[in-house]
Curated annotation (Swiss-Prot):
<dbReference type="Pfam" id="PF02637">
    <property type="entry name" value="GatB_Yqey"/>
</dbReference>
<dbReference type="GO" id="GO:0050567">
    <property type="term" value="F:glutaminyl-tRNA synthase (glutamine-hydrolyzing) activity"/>
</dbReference>
<dbReference type="InterPro" id="IPR006075">
    <property type="entry name" value="Asn/Gln-tRNA_Trfase_suB/E_cat"/>
</dbReference>
<dbReference type="InterPro" id="IPR004413">
    <property type="entry name" value="GatB"/>
</dbReference>
<dbReference type="GO" id="GO:0032543">
    <property type="term" value="P:mitochondrial translation"/>
</dbReference>
<dbReference type="InterPro" id="IPR017959">
    <property type="entry name" value="Asn/Gln-tRNA_amidoTrfase_suB/E"/>
</dbReference>
<comment type="function">
    <text>Allows the formation of correctly charged Gln-tRNA(Gln) through the transamidation of misacylated Glu-tRNA(Gln) in the mitochondria. The reaction takes place in the presence of glutamine and ATP through an activated gamma-phospho-Glu-tRNA(Gln).</text>
</comment>
<dbReference type="InterPro" id="IPR018027">
    <property type="entry name" value="Asn/Gln_amidotransferase"/>
</dbReference>
<keyword id="KW-0067">ATP-binding</keyword>
<comment type="subunit">
    <text>Subunit of the heterotrimeric GatFAB amidotransferase (AdT) complex, composed of A, B and F subunits.</text>
</comment>
<protein>
    <recommendedName>
        <fullName>Glutamyl-tRNA(Gln) amidotransferase subunit B, mitochondrial</fullName>
        <ecNumber>6.3.5.-</ecNumber>
    </recommendedName>
</protein>
<comment type="similarity">
    <text>Belongs to the GatB/GatE family. GatB subfamily.</text>
</comment>
<keyword id="KW-0648">Protein biosynthesis</keyword>
<dbReference type="GO" id="GO:0030956">
    <property type="term" value="C:glutamyl-tRNA(Gln) amidotransferase complex"/>
</dbReference>
<keyword id="KW-0809">Transit peptide</keyword>
<feature type="transit peptide" description="Mitochondrion">
    <location>
        <begin position="1"/>
        <end position="6"/>
    </location>
</feature>
<dbReference type="InterPro" id="IPR017958">
    <property type="entry name" value="Gln-tRNA_amidoTrfase_suB_CS"/>
</dbReference>
Length: 511
């Protein structure tokens, strides 16, 4: 549920932190857009993307097999998925709805009529001998996604703002293929619904390519269209690169944002080098192996897919009002939410705002908490205290354990931060109510820590630690921290450490 956030919230050991830092540094050095790379003014860079996105449906696009393709190999397949004769496809309406949500979110023109075509090729991961896709009449066309100040790229480079916008050529609904592991094929993935989002070649920098992919991930997660993960293959990106209007080169097998950066840099340099040596470029498909792009096929031996309409599937005929109806049913857009959450009265950090957008349950929790707390530190209480408490205990965030109104009451209590953390930890660890935690930890009104109680505790500790007291009075003032530690342990964090520190210094007559 909140794994992406909680995984990064838990405290790490010093050695793990050092290892992570070294790894991050090495990765940054390898994947940095700027490192040892530049575009040459005389060789204009153009780029477009083809983004394959798995839709979050319970069943496959044309069968009732489940979409859990990471389970035991070939455990979620039907006769249709493996192309056995006598089986016919039946369109999953949930997949159509999610595809339409994506089309509306990307500002596309939803087509009143679309239909499916067969894309013929022979490969072990496609047992039917063809893929069902939408080549001639896609579901949606002519969309766009616009960059803004939240995307981390330079924008507004032309008066009409054209360079701020990436045009979407089309969105087509299609089925995924099986997955090949050496000589073995797993067909669990075969038939999972996909949308292919094809952009125009509007990218003039690698920064914009990355910004678009991240913005797209945020969008599909927020609208619950797809998990948005590149590492699991839920989103797969093919990159089209060309220089000076030469024939485009399609790069496949790209699985991370780092690979996107490095594949583009390598391919751009390869094309520039070819041209500077007097060579010519041809339309190609190339595979990325993590270091370089390798020729898969050229225009001369390109596959003729022999597209033709799928006679077993009817046309999709939609109401003229469908786009408007879906748009009005969607929640607030990511850009609108970011603008609202990063401005007054919330004033959230951009990273925190983006985390909220990708986790609807957490967003609802934060807004419910803020409606009661209504102070600038609301995000700190949620992110730095609440979520960290769950993460440190290795637990998944559960709103039922600490409801927003209960958390707001805890935050408003007349207790120091250490005491509030102690109560929160007790609630999460033992799954008890706030009242029960207060009672079990001794924070009831008649048990509340007072200055008089703190003074008495200090006197008691001084009397029972004469050796440490003698050391302090002989000039080793830092030894007072031992007494402070004993007092904190005795009171289980009911007082701030500074309270005891000041009292010990006062009672021992040291500065």
């Amino acid at each position: 549920m909140l794994r992406r956030y909680l995984a990064t919230s838990a405290s790490a050991t010093a050695s793990a932190t050092a290892t992570a830092s070294a790894s991050a540094s090495a990765s940054a050095s390898k994947n940095s857009i700027k490192s040892n790379f530049k575009f040459h003014p005389e060789y204009k860079f153009k780029c477009g993307l083809e983004i394959h996105t798995q839709l979050k449906t319970k069943y496959k696009l044309f069968s009732l097999s489940r979409t859990s393709f990471n389970d035991t190999p070939n455990s979620h397949i039907s006769y249709f998925d493996v192309g056995l004769p006598g089986t016919q496809p039946k369109l999953n309406p949930e997949a159509l709805y999610l595809a339409l949500k994506a089309a509306v979110a990307l500002n596309c023109e939803v087509q009143q009529m679309s239909r499916f075509d067969r894309k013929h090729y022979f490969y072990p991961d496609q047992p039917m001998g063809y893929q069902i896709t939408q080549n001639f009449h896609p579901l949606a066309k002519n969309g766009y996604l616009t960059f803004n100040e939240f995307d981390g790229v330079e924008i507004a480079t032309s008066k009409d703002g054209a360079n701020d916008t990436i045009r979407i050529e089309k969105i087509q609904l299609e089925q995924d293929t099986g997955k090949k592991y050496g000589d073995i094929i797993d067909y669990n993935r075969a038939g999972i619904p996909l949308i292919e989002v094809v952009t125009k070649p509007d990218f003039d920098s690698i920064e914009k390519v990355l910004a678009f992919v991240k913005k797209y991930q945020l969008l599909v997660r927020h609208f619950d269209i797809c998990s948005g993960d590149l590492e699991t293959g839920a989103i797969r990106v093919d990159v089209n690169v060309n220089v000076n209007d030469s024939p485009r080169v399609e790069i496949k097998n790209i699985s991370t944002t780092g690979d996107i950066v490095n594949a583009i840099k390598y391919e751009y340099n390869r094309q520039v080098e070819t041209l500077t040596k007097g060579g010519s470029l041809e339309q190609q498909t190339r595979n990325w192996d993590g270091i370089r792009t390798n020729l898969a096929r050229s225009k001369e031996n390109a596959i003729d897919y022999r597209y033709f309409p799928d006679s077993e599937l009817p046309q999709i005929i939609l109401s003229p009002d469908i786009a408007h109806d879906i748009k009005t049913s969607l929640p607030e857009s990511p850009d609108s939410l970011l603008a609202r959450l990063t401005s007054s009265p919330h004033n959230l950090q951009l990273a925190h705002a983006k985390n909220l957008i990708t986790e609807p349950e957490l967003l609802h929790y934060y807004e419910s908490f803020f409606a009661i707390h209504r102070k600038p530190d609301a995000d700190k209480w949620v992110f730095q205290e609440l979520l960290t408490a769950f993460a440190k205990l290795g637990k998944t965030f559960d709103v039922e354990i600490v409801k927003p109104n209960v958390f707001a009451h805890l935050v408003s209590m007349d207790l120091n931060l250490v005491s509030k953390r102690l109560i929160l930890k007790h609630m999460v660890q033992n799954e008890v109510s706030l009242d029960k935690a207060i009672e079990q930890l001794g924070f009831k009104e008649d048990q509340k820590p007072t200055t008089e109680l703190a003074e008495d505790i200090c006197k008691e500790i001084i009397l029972t630690n004469q050796q440490i007291v003698d050391r302090i009075q002989s000039g080793h003032a830092k030894a007072v921290e031992v007494l402070v530690g004993n007092a904190m342990k005795k009171t289980r964090g009911k007082f701030a450490a500074q309270t005891f520190r000041s009292l010990f210094k006062e009672q021992l007559g040291i500065s």
